[in-house]
Amino acid sequence: MNPEYDYLFKLLLIGDSGVGKSCLLLRFADDSYLDSYISTIGVDFKIRTVEQDGKTIKLQIWDTAGQERFRTITSSYYRGAHGIIVTYDVTDLESFNNVKQWLNEIDRYASENVNKLLVGNKCDLTSQKVVSTETAKAFADELGIPFLETSAKNATNVEEAFMAMTAAIKTRMASQPAGGSKPPTVQIRGQPVNQQSGCCSS
């Protein structure tokens, strides 16, 4: 057991290109914001350790590229994820309409009980908003997914989004039978996964 943390959670940020996934990650992990937009090539990740209910939780947050051409690369990163934050841009209707497609990706590649959170980013751009809070909330409620509107630019609800996801995963892990207290060890039907047999060896 690593004494530095009690839990290690892998989180994914997914959604269309340009919705602000990298900005959300930068705001949460480094409390910084970049106005200039640089498209993420492939996958990038950051780590932040948080305290919750007296437990130290290490969050490994992966920023997956939104472009269609990277879909095959990022599909492997769904595996092993504890939580997935599906992000859209409140000023871009297409990015919201594509949320269904991203949820299909989750159903296809992620584990069955993975935690999900719907996030509408760029809520500071009120005059340009085209996806109403009510529409998004109704959509999320229909699917049984928590929903928050965020702004990476002014930090609105960014901390809340990641901490809510962390709490939900922690609750789920605690309610699971055997092995719940040792999250760094992934168990599949009671068998520890061999750390040596990586899928990247080919």
Curated annotation (Swiss-Prot):
Positions bound to GTP: 15-23, 33-40, 63-67, 121-124, 151-153
InterPro entries in the cross-refs: P-loop_NTPase (IPR027417), Rab (IPR050227), Small_GTP-bd (IPR005225), Small_GTPase (IPR001806)
Superkingdom in the source lineage: Eukaryota
Name this polypeptide is given: Ras-related protein RABD2c
Sequence similarity: Belongs to the small GTPase superfamily. Rab family.
Gene3D superfamilies: P-loop containing nucleotide triphosphate hydrolases
Gene Ontology biological process terms, A to Z: pollen development; pollen tube growth; protein transport; vesicle-mediated transport
Main localization (coarse): membrane
Lipid-linked residues (S-geranylgeranyl cysteine): C199, C200
Xref: Pfam families: Ras (PF00071)
Entries under SMART domains matching the protein: RAB (SM00175), RAN (SM00176), RAS (SM00173), RHO (SM00174)
Motif segment (Effector region): 37-45
The entry's keywords: Cell membrane, ER-Golgi transport, Golgi apparatus, GTP-binding, Lipoprotein, Membrane, Nucleotide-binding, Prenylation, Protein transport, Transport
A cellular component annotation (GO) from this entry: plasmodesma
GO molecular function: GTP binding; GTPase activity
Region (Disordered): 174-202
UniProt subcellular location: Cell membrane; Golgi apparatus, trans-Golgi network membrane; Golgi apparatus membrane
SUPFAM superfamilies found in the cross-reference section: P-loop containing nucleoside triphosphate hydrolases
Chain's gene name: RABD2C
Stated role: Protein transport. Regulator of membrane traffic from the Golgi apparatus towards the endoplasmic reticulum (ER).
UniProt biased composition (Polar residues): 192-202
Topology of this chain in the membrane: Lipid-anchor
